[in-house]
Amino acid sequence: MSHATGAAGASGPIETRLPTGVKDFLPVKAAKLEYLQATLRQVFARWGFRPVIPASLEDLSVLELGLGSDLREKTFRFDDRQSGRLVAFPPDITPQVARIAATRLHDLPLPYRLCYSGRVLRHAEQRLGKEREFWQAGVELIGLESPEADAEMIAMTVEGLLAVGAREFTIDIGQVAFLRGILEGLPLPAAAARELRAAIATKDGTSLQRLLDDHPVPDRQREEVLALPRLFGGIEALDRAATVVDNDVSKRALDNLHRVLQVL
């Protein structure tokens, strides 16, 4: 049996505490985690998804192309001594898979069915005691835009959750185009637009009202924005949304969601 010993001349015990927000996984929990990952990989494979393992580091400028403002602020970044560029530990694997699909898979036919799993790091408010290291597993279906494709992803998600033992869960279904249609053309400076998106993400109606009061937003667009925090729930939420939005982009997004639910 080997024993670790301290360096000659050491004056005290070595500090072995981990940084805040990260953890080791000892054998029992590590085995559970391995089981969950293996089970999900089997589900992904049955649906035709192939694994990719993205790089541990990314150029910050490339990574930020696929990150929202919230994740940009949570990204661990530092100077690369070799290149002199800013690099980062990805806080989300999704933008990395998008980069791989856009730059490395030209010799493969569309659609791409790609799956992944791994650790990601994110800055967190220390006073809140939040984790900074997460396990993320997921899939990306690229190059096939249809209600049937969306329904396929939802059905596979349900199968994956059941396979790992989940029995009570809720799946939130949304459409980025619906929000884009509401926000397009809003007469807001860049800083106010970012603040508005953050308030929408947290369903902060008070902040939305304040931002709209501070800028000359037309009444119809104001009504659409202020309705956003209330537009959640079952299929009835789509009916409520249809009475609120008055732009073609959002209307088409609602129509697509209706068709997805019909396929399911």
Where are these regions (language model features)?
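Charged, compositionally biased N-terminal leader segments and the immediate start
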Residues: 1-17, 188, 195
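Polyanion/phosphate-binding surface patch
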Residues: 21, 55-87
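Short acidic, glycine/serine/threonine-rich loops at helix termini
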Residues: 63-65, 126-132, 181-186
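Acidic, His- and aromatic-enriched active-site or binding-groove loops in soluble protein domains
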Residues: 73-82, 187-212, 217-218
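Short, conserved phosphate-binding/catalytic loop or strand-edge motifs used
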Residues: 131-137, 173-181
